Every structure is written in structure tokens, then in C-alpha cells.
């Protein structure tokens, strides 16, 4: 249940906001208005980075923030997972478009060093991250 108490609404799905159906988006718009939501969080794939502003405009005057499921800043590891984010994409590149990231850890062959490095980079470049 959305109360609007904090004025922040985090839309959690395991896909991209741009892939939500029209009925769901209309429902979110209605909740934003009715509950006086001033800040919305959505997840979106990096491939949608050039569509974020247009999508966010739909929910004005609320501020819309996006997080990206980048999984890791290790380019070779990320590439091996075939998530569609190129090896040359840096944390700074992602931060140009996204306010937060979702990191994946404890996969086969993972290391404490890699996880801690990803966390350090997330702290440096983003206002939000989840592991």
C-alpha cells in the first residue's frame, strides 16, 4: 500500500520502466498525484539511457530517478554475463544517465576484491546502490 508519507515511491520490477504496460503507467501517474509523491525511482536497462528524460516527463512535476542493473563495473565479468552493457562502459558513463545502480555479487568465480571494488565505485559515482 502506498501512503505517500515520505513522498518517495520506488517502483521495483525486474525489468525496465519503459517496458511497463500503459495501464500500469497510468496507475503510477494516478498514485503520484493522489499521494503527493515528489520523487519516483524506476529501474531501466542501460540501452534506454537516451529515453529516460522523455519517460520522466510523464510524471512531472515529480522528480524521477533511475537505477541501472549494471551488475558489475568489471567489464570482462559484465561481458561474460551478456547483459548488453559494453565492456567500454565506465561508472562515469552510467552516472551521466542514472542516479543509482544494482550490483550482483557472489556468482561463480566472484571475489571479495571485485565486490568491494564495485561497492567503492558505486559510492563514488551514485547516490544509491544495492548489492
Where are these regions (language model features)?
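Core AdoMet radical
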Residues: 2-22, 32-51, 62-89, 100-107, ...
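Conserved strand-to-helix beginnings and helix N-cap segments that scaffold or border functional pockets
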Residues: 21-25, 52-53, 112-116
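A generic secondary-structure signal
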Residues: 30-31, 55, 117-122
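Short, conserved loop/helix-junction motifs that constitute active-site signature segments
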Residues: 33-35, 57-61, 95, 123-125
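Catalytic cores of alpha/beta
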Residues: 107-125
Amino acid at each position: 500500500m502506498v501512503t505517500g508519507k515520505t513522498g518517495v515511491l520506488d517502483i521495483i520490477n525486474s525489468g525496465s520502466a519503459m517496458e511497463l504496460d500503459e495501464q500500469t503507467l497510468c496507475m503510477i501517474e494516478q498514485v503520484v498525484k493522489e499521494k503527493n509523491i515528489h520523487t519516483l525511482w524506476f529501474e531501466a536497462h542501460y540501452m534506454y539511457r537516451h529515453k529516460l528524460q522523455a519517460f520522466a516527463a510523464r510524471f512531472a512535476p515529480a522528480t524521477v530517478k533511475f537505477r541501472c542493473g549494471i551488475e558489475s563495473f568489471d567489464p570482462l565479468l559484465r561481458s561474460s554475463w551478456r547483459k548488453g552493457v559494453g565492456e567500454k562502459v565506465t561508472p562515469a558513463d552510467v552516472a551521466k544517465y542514472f542516479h543509482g545502480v544494482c550490483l550482483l555479487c557472489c556468482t561463480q568465480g566472484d571475489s571479495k576484491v571485485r565486490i568491494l571494488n564495485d561497492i567503492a565505485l558505486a559510492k563514488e559515482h551514485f547516490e544509491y546502490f544495492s548489492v
